[in-house]
Amino acid sequence: MFIGTIILVLSFLGFVFNRRNIILAFICLETMLLGINLILLRNSVLFDDISGSLFAIVIIILAGVESAIGLSLLVSYYRLRGVINSYGI
């Protein structure tokens, strides 16, 4: 019924329980943003407001930029140190 809320809660739990692996933490953060976007889009359609849809598009763009920058930083850190778990940092 409320798929956005379910995705948001499950990804938050995944983030809390998988804090050791940074890649999984990034994936959980991205799915949290997906859940927030689904909630925004649902409320935008429900209240017949276009600003929620526009804000969801902005969040999708920023999430793509954030994941590209984060992944490139992880690749550089892995090349430098050889480990990418959170205890190695």
Swiss-Prot record:
Cited InterPro entries: NADH_UbQ_OxRdtase_chain4L/K, NUOK/Mnh_C1-like
Alphabetic keyword roster: Electron transport, Membrane, Mitochondrion, NAD, Respiratory chain, Translocase, Transmembrane, Transmembrane helix, Transport, Ubiquinone
Protein's cellular compartments: Mitochondrion membrane
One BP term from GO: ATP synthesis coupled electron transport
Transmembrane segments: 21-41, 55-75
GO molecular function: NADH dehydrogenase (ubiquinone) activity
UniProt keyword annotation of Membrane present: yes
GO cellular component terms, semicolon-separated: mitochondrial membrane; respiratory chain complex I
Disulfide bonds: none
Catalytic activity annotation: a ubiquinone + NADH + 5 H(+)(in) = a ubiquinol + NAD(+) + 4 H(+)(out)
Membrane topology classification: Multi-pass membrane protein
Domain of life, per lineage: Eukaryota
EC number: 7.1.1.2
Subunit note: Complex I is composed of 37 different subunits.
Family of the protein in this entry: Belongs to the complex I subunit 4L family.
Function comment: Core subunit of the mitochondrial membrane respiratory chain NADH dehydrogenase (Complex I) that is believed to belong to the minimal assembly required for catalysis. Complex I functions in the transfer of electrons from NADH to the respiratory chain. The immediate electron acceptor for the enzyme is believed to be ubiquinone.
Name the record gives this protein: NADH-ubiquinone oxidoreductase chain 4L
Organism of derivation: Yarrowia lipolytica (strain CLIB 122 / E 150) (Yeast)
